Amino acid sequence: MQDQQQVIHKAQPWHGKVGLIYGQRQGKTEMQRCFTQAPFRIQRPFYPEGNRVCHTVLLHTAGGIVGGDRLSLDLELKPESHVFLTTAAANKIYRTNGETAQQDGIIHQAPGSILEYFPQEMIIFDGAEYHQSLRVNLAPGAVWCGWEVLRFGRTARGEKFISGNWRGLTEIWQDDELLWGDRQWLPGHPEVFAAWNGLNNQPVVGSLALVGLEISEAQMAELRQTMATIQQGLGGITQLPKGVLCRYRGPSSTEVKRWFISLWQNWRSLYSPQPPTLSRVWQTY
């Protein structure tokens, strides 16, 4: 395995890109433009919920991200389009080869558009150096819903994230107003991994946010009741000026995804008449 990982680290870095444009025509959301550059690929869109919601699966064919990789995602949703975007498998961030891996995303959503962005979990190897950023520009009436699930260290191997750095920045803007900003830095260190205000010896953290619409106190109370269903780990729910933010810290990526899916199923009706349908790549949840 050591030799295999050394080979991975010596490979040439990727400069991958994804560019997608969606539009709605006669009640059907269509992928109107698709540009990919290796290692990314896009599966053919499918419609398990009917024509209104376009399900899209993003593939990273290299199997993981290494130091020096530069990856970018550019999405545009035209008025009234509704897109459900996920990934085919968990992503891996390998131990650094001396360089930092970078992934950046920019999303533009027109009035009335809906994006549900639910990538599968990211596994950050001990010693990884990784930076990511995401900026979402929402027009009035647009809704963004997304999650991030991170596992720090290969837990099954007894590995902890005690060296390296993980940095992330997410910003959701509307009419030059920052609706939600989330800047995080988790340095790999034994004290940070163990500290109660760090990972508290829990390798999995997750964030789920719904941004772009008002959430009433009654709706917030209903959402908070779902925290009682968490069997492993801790959850928290915070009301945003135009949305809601949910956090998890615990031992199980399966547990956090089950909780996040239940929240999404609960609030889907707030912005779409379409009953939620689980993605076919989520069959194990």
Curated annotation (Swiss-Prot):
It is found in: Cytoplasm. InterPro entries: UreD (IPR002669). GO terms for cellular component: cytoplasm. GO terms for molecular function: nickel cation binding. The keyword Cytoplasm applies. Its main location: cytoplasm. Keywords: Chaperone, Cytoplasm, Nickel insertion. HAMAP family: UreD. Required for maturation of urease via the functional incorporation of the urease nickel metallocenter. Belongs to the UreD family. UreD, UreF and UreG form a complex that acts as a GTP-hydrolysis-dependent molecular chaperone, activating the urease apoprotein by helping to assemble the nickel containing metallocenter of UreC. The UreE protein probably delivers the nickel. This is Urease accessory protein UreD. It comes from Picosynechococcus sp. (strain ATCC 27264 / PCC 7002 / PR-6). The gene is ureD.
